[in-house]
Amino acid sequence: MYKIQEAEMLANNIYRMVVEAPRVAQHCLPGQFVIVKADEEGERIPLTICDYDREAGTITIVFMPIGESTKKMKDLKAGDAFMDFVGPLGQPSEFCSEDIEELKKKRIVFVAGGVGTAPVYPQLKWLHEHGITADAIVGAKTKDLVILEKEMSAVSNLYITTDDGSYVRKGMGTDVLRDLVQNQGKQYDVCVAIGPMIMMKFVCLLTKELNIPTVVSMNPVSYTHLTLPTTSRV
């Protein structure tokens, strides 16, 4: 069993849990995921690793309760436990395999939409730990859906935008990216976009126009008899 140390609602319908999983914490890297199962009857659910603490032996996950199993998960509290917590799985971020000195020469920008902020954070944290501070643009529908602001601002140059203008500035993440490049003189060697498919589509249309190589992250779930996920970055 994998004990839950912390459980909280980060924002409206977005939840965060810190789980005791020493082996996973020891070996995971940004971009990887775990498969969790709350109980014997529950589905196996793939969730991106949002953070990890090797010394404490913990993994942080962030999720939105959409299906039946994740709706049950949100009711778990500190002291409860997952039956299964398998990982780390999937390919780490490409940054983890690059030469650090070469990576330090790159100008990197991340664009995150909604809960897509969760898989962006560990990549920013890893880069920061290796002496690289990237730019990060976080977009949300409204102020109440902005998550991990404190954590993100500690490891990146953070820009926040909301669809309704209720926090910082009104607009889309693409509006901020265009402004940074065309009006503030920023230049980027690579863009990483993680969020809703429609958001990533418009980021790619913009970065194509701006001639910025772009990586997007897609996490479709393939329901086989084992209910295993497939993850890919394009």
What function would you assign to each model-found segment?
Residues 2, 224-230:
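Conserved small/polar residues in nucleotide/adenosyl-binding loops
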Residues 71-221:
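FNR/FR-type flavoprotein reductase catalytic core
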Residues 2-80:
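Ferredoxin-reductase
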